[in-house]
Amino acid sequence: MSDKDPPESPVVTGVASTLKDENCEPVEKPEDKSQPVVSTRKRPETKPSSDLEASALPAQVSLAVAKETASKDVPQTGWGYWGSWGKSLLSSASATVATVGQGISNVIEKAETSLGIPSPTEISAEVKQAAGEKNAGENGSLLVAAPFGMLSTISTAVQSTGKSVISGGLDALEFIGKKTMDVIAEGDPGFKRTKGLMNRTSTLSQVLREAKDKEEQRPSNEVTMETDKKTHYGLLFDEFQGLSHLEALEMLSRESEIKVKSILSSLSGEELQTTRLELEQLKEVFSLAEFCEEEEEERQGDDNFTKEITDLFAQLHVSSRPEKLARARNTAYKWIRTSLARPVAEKEEGEKESEAGNTEEAQKHSIEDIHAFAIRSLAELTACSIELFHKTAALVLHGQKQEVTALERSQTLSQMTVMLCKDLASLSKEFTTCLTTAGVREKADVLNPVITAVFLEASNSASYIQDAFQLLLPVLQISLIESKTESSTCEPQSRDL
């Protein structure tokens, strides 16, 4: 080495001091040691400044890539993470609501199909489409929105969708309920009647009128229907004005009962006790004792009945007379005597004739005639009896002077009621005798139902007469109170005289 060449060690230390580390920060210079630098160390090649900057740039890029990779591995806790989570939650909520709507539709599908209700699939499709459009429009804003705002949006979407599904389901169920009630009402003719009876108490006249209206509404395009109408008790009872008189009697009884309650509420003390005692005595008369029909002797003629019923009406001291009732009763017994003589004549004619078919047809027709006339006679006698009770009640209420007491009138009316019921029982026996005589050659399956029907209608007729008699109780109670008031007002006047 020559003396002109510069020393190598200072050059190496100078270059090293200008280098930077990978972070482009100057490296601290190590402390100088007292030991000499080895002269045999190879001198590193010096690089230009451009090469130094190029080597530092890749180091920075690699450092940034490393940091990004590390950030992916670490769980995110910033605002960006809430966007993807909210989107997933909204999709799950929409799918759940759609499933609920589909479940409701499946539940009512059978009822809708049977009742003809429109299918709710269109409503469900519109709900799903609206939820999808709303989700698509809100996805962009949810990525940058705050978590609380996102939750509010989800709640609104779920609430609106749920309201649509639930309201649609409730409307469908309400329509199903109304349609079901209509179908039940159409399939059950007694549904409306049952509903009406639950709201009010039916009276005897209402029951009879409903039965008559129901019979009139039946189709009459068959011969059997016409025959049934001839033997229908309700239609015949209304034909003889029995239903009208029964309704009028019920009205008078109801008005009288209201007056009795009003008068009793205005009384007090001893006067109230005395009035109640008298009313109880009057009420005991209306308690009809059970009578035995077998002990009743059969009537031999019409004169006895007419005389007895006329005498009873005379004791009432009213202007009405039982002529119509007596005439209807005499007509019935006269027809019975004629029908009893007819089978004997037909039997004699049948022996002379060679054909037995004509005799059987005549006997069969005779049974139908007897049955029809029996029902008609029972309805007519019952209607006439109720008409007499109605007229008696009107005359008692509007009579100017009471010649007999209310207690005496109640006793007379009670005897009359028992007499009418026994006569109806006797009349039904006469009709069954006619049926048995005319249907000797008939089978029991044909004759027994007809006889049973006659006895049944006779029992119903007696019940109707007894019910009409009970309607007279409030009328006679008012009569008793009025007579007592008149007597109390007449006593001071007689004392003054």
Curated annotation (Swiss-Prot):
The keyword rRNA processing is annotated on this UniProt entry: no
Record protein name field: Protein FAM114A2
Ranges for region Disordered: 1-54, 344-364
Family as reported in the entry's similarity comment: Belongs to the FAM114 family.
InterPro entries listed in its UniProt record: DUF719 (IPR007998)
Record Pfam families: DUF719 (PF05334)
Keywords: Phosphoprotein
Compositional bias ranges of the Basic and acidic residues kind: 19-34
Segments passing through the bilayer: none
PANTHER family assigned to the protein according to its UniProt record, in alphabetical order: FI01459P (PTHR12842), PROTEIN FAM114A2 (PTHR12842:SF3)
The organism's place on the tree of life at top rank: Eukaryota
UniProt modified residues of type Phosphoserine: 84, 205
